[in-house]
């Protein structure tokens, strides 16, 4: 598959295979096209050439580097309730607490939370969806050390496949069983 913009490839063609247990780290310095690869895999950008296909039974969850909340003038409880209307308030509070969003943090407007707290809410929402593939673009952005450790602990317990873009080698090397280096 070739990736790029406006019909121009930004990388040489890439190719890799995964199975249901692959935890793949897309490794490379900033600006080489790792996010572009993920966006192309997710069909948010067209491939310049070739294609990437998933098994028909794939259930994919994707967290982008740039967080997108439809309405940032709601709190975490409301966001989760709108995203998962069948979840009880108690279950929402329990799930938010697991990612460190407790008490008053759960009722503050998302726009008033730190970047790390917003990441935690997105991760909490992501973890509620049934999936067998996680695609994560810099999931540790804005997280403190304890939150990073909790995230990677949860990812290690995840039984599906993972495609990870991260500049956190300490965590990525422990988590991933396959590395794909992006180089020019």
Regions found by a protein language model. Name each.
Residues 1-184:
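ABC ATP-binding cassette signature C-motif
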């Amino acid at each position: 598959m070739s990736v790029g913009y406006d019909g121009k490839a930004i990388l040489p063609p890439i190719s890799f295979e995964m199975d249901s247990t692959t935890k793949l780290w897309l490794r490379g310095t900033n600006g080489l096209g790792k996010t572009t690869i993920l966006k192309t895999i997710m069909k948010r950008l067209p491939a310049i050439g070739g294609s990437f296909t998933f098994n028909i039974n794939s259930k994919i969850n994707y967290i982008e580097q740039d967080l997108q909340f439809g309405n940032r003038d709601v709190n975490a409880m409301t966001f989760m309730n709108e995203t998962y209307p069948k979840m009880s308030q108690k279950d929402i509070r329990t799930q938010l607490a697991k990612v460190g969003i407790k008490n008053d943090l759960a009722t503050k407007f998302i726009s008033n939370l730190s970047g790390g707290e917003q990441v935690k809410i997105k991760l909490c929402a992501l973890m509620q969806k049934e999936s067998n593939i996680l695609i994560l673009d810099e999931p540790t952005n804005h997280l403190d050390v304890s939150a990073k450790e909790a995230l990677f602990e949860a990812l290690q317990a995840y039984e599906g496949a993972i495609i990870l873009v991260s500049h956190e080698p300490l965590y990525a090397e422990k988590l991933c069983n396959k590395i794909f280096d992006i180089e020019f």
